[in-house]
Design a protein with these regions (language model features):
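Short, positively charged and aromatic/hydrophobic N-terminal segments
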Residues: 9, 13, 22, 26, ...
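Short acidic-hydrophobic catalytic motif
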Residues: 33-342
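Catalytic cores of phosphodiester-bond-cleaving enzymes
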Residues: 17-19
């Protein structure tokens, strides 16, 4: 989950678009030197043993228990609501995306799970193909707002190789998605998984940031600590709409970049159960884990959202102004394309 972005000034936006287009042009050269028909395959993996977490949901504020279990080959990532009658269980795929406001929500009937992007990102990056997740509530625990604890838990329990090949889809031709709001995504052929994002905000603190991951092996070091973020001026409307009931300065990177009255700031910190802050001190309300942490978190989110295609991708994904709504729409279209070719 992370904050929505806006169009920058025209000159800057055109410059970013020019950079974005170079990836498409570079593809014609890249295609000449790589064998696009080759698919790097390996066997599927699941967890060697279970692990468990508990914590509050970012939006509901509920205390939720989450358990992660090994699963059989070709199961994929499945999520069970153990608190509901019959314990309904469905796969984490784009078919079930129902909402994308402040996070990715999967839903089918009474089965609903919110804020799935962080854990899906970690499972994908760590090479977990099959896993059963059980929850006793409607949302994944937010933990510290990053993928850190998921990565550490997966490393601690280890992985087990399974006697079945991974479901791999290799991109062989450029795919481009755009939206009327200025979001763009290129998916290019590559012999492994790589991704890059650029975010654009009309903010002196955020501005334009880029983050990239050249190999999933670097995920832990380069992305796992990047926390979800939001602007202080966005918090009050979210609270009034019944969102971020579990939000605090320990599970999100909060950015104070638009001055407000001390009374208004006190109201919000009191509502969140946090210590009061000085309304004159603009900036990040907690230390950054990376200089470009917001962009890195957007990349973390992108990996989680795109994992909903249900396949391991051999591709380079380049996204301009990504967000959950745009990411999952692209993922749905990509999944439909993949399934139509099976």
């Amino acid at each position: 989950m992370s904050s929505s972005s806006f169009l920058p000034e025209n000159n800057e936006y055109l410059h970013i678009l020019k950079i974005f287009r170079t990836f498409a042009l570079a593809f014609s050269l890249h295609k000449k030197i790589m064998n696009l028909s080759s698919i790097r395959t390996m066997n599927q993996h699941t967890l060697l043993s279970p692990f468990h977490f508990e914590g509050k949901g970012l939006h509901t504020g509920l205390h939720i228990h989450a358990s992660f279990y090994p699963a059989a080959p070709n199961t994929g990532i499945r999520i069970c609501r153990s608190d509901l009658e019959g314990q309904p269980t469905y796969p984490a795929v784009a078919d079930y995306v129902a909402a994308t406001e402040r996070g990715t929500v999967l839903e089918y009937g009474e089965w609903k799970v919110s804020t799935v992007e962080h854990v899906l990102s970690a499972l994908y990056a760590m090479g977990v193909d099959n896993c059963l997740i059980t929850l006793d509530g409607p949302e994944m625990p937010i933990l510290d707002g990053s993928a850190k604890y998921y990565i550490e838990a997966i490393e601690q329990v280890g992985l087990q190789e399974q006697d079945a090949p991974q479901k791999v889809y290799a991109i062989t031709e450029k795919i481009e998605y755009t939206s009327e709001q200025g979001n763009q995504m290129l998916i290019l052929p590559c012999d492994h998984y790589a991704a890059q994002v650029t975010i654009c905000y009309p903010s002196a603190l955020l501005g334009t940031q880029t983050a990239q991951l050249d190999d999933l092996a670097d995920y832990k070091q380069q992305l796992s600590l990047a926390r979800t973020f939001c602007l202080v001026r966005e918090i009050e409307p979210l609270l009034r709409r019944g969102l971020i009931k579990g939000g605090d300065l320990q599970n999100a990177l909060v950015i104070y970049e638009t001055p407000m009255s001390q009374d208004d700031l006190d109201f919000m910190t009191d509502k969140l159960g946090q210590p009061r802050l000085d309304a004159n001190q603009l900036g990040y309300l907690s230390p950054l884990n990376y200089p470009n942490e917001p962009a890195r978190h957007k990349l973390l989110d992108l990996i989680g959202d795109m994992s909903l295609c249900g396949f391991r991708l051999q591709a380079q994904i380049v996204a301009l102004r990504p967000g959950h709504s745009f990411n999952t729409k692209c993922c749905k279209q990509l999944r439909e394309k993949i399934l139509s070719e099976q």
